[in-house]
A protein has these predicted regions:
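N-terminal cationic and glycine-rich segments that engage phosphates or anionic surfaces
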Residues: 1-102, 109-236
Length: 236
């Protein structure tokens, strides 16, 4: 007799595979968040890059979005912020520039072209942001080489690794879109935020202390974080 798999089993398998694939991508993301970038003094890095010193700053926000990778200067240190910025820029340009507006109205083919443009802009922004981050590390005396040919070579490698990390994260998000449960970028952002949950609780506690002590800074910072978070979710 021919044996057939019951429909409910087939349906269950079809539903569970995307979930397992998404979890696998999240594991890869967390592994990349601990891979150290070369040519950095890890001992100096731990003493200088202290997230507790970044409270109420944009650095704290970036560290949260990267799942703590920013403070450790790892492969995914820049997180997915270059892609988010690129998406925002392209969406605004689609309204302001007629050729891009027409492209956005061309259906699936137009969306693929806009997605390709967004990727290129992401790499460009990644290089810019990686360069800025490198100089931050250089000024913090975290880099191993600070003069001569070694300085230039290590600078290029570090910047390219940071940029490559952003490109890999963008690719991981697209894999979740294609083979996982969808919303890949949002899921990676969520995974990073969950990894930083203890730090977030600590930051919220500091905000609360500011409010209890009568500081008006609390009433500015909390809405700012909410607006930034909602903007990211809406764009992605």
């Amino acid at each position: 007799d021919n044996t057939t798999i019951p429909d409910f089993v087939t349906e269950w398998i079809n539903n569970i595979i995307p979930i397992l694939f998404t979890l696998l991508i999240i594991v890869v993301f967390r592994i990349g968040s601990v891979i150290q970038v070369p040519f950095l003094d890890t001992a100096a890095l731990r003493s200088v890059m202290n997230p507790d010193d970044w409270s109420n700053t944009m650095l704290s926000y970036m560290n949260t979005l990267s799942g703590g990778a920013f403070s450790n200067a790892t492969l995914f240190a820049m997180g997915i912020t270059p892609y988010i910025n690129s998406s925002i820029i392209i969406q605004l340009l689609c309204v302001a520039i007629p050729p891009l507006e027409r492209l956005a109205r061309e259906g699936e083919a137009g969306r693929r072209k806009i997605s390709a443009i967004t990727r290129y802009v992401t790499v460009g922004l990644g290089i810019i942001q990686g360069t800025a981050y490198y100089f931050y590390l250089l000024n913090s005396k975290v880099t191993l080489y600070n003069s001569g040919f070694e300085l230039w070579f290590s600078a290029i490698v570090i910047i390219l690794v940071f940029t490559a990390g952003t490109a890999v994260m963008m690719w991981l998000g697209e894999q979740i879109n294609s083979h996982g449960i969808g919303n890949g970028i949002s899921i990676l952002l969520f995974a990073g935020i969950v990894a930083q949950f203890p730090q977030i609780i600590n930051t919220l506690g500091q905000y609360w202390n500011l409010a209890v002590n009568g500081s008006t800074q609390f009433f500015f910072l909390v809405p700012l974080w909410v607006v930034l978070f909602v903007a990211v979710v809406w764009i992605i």
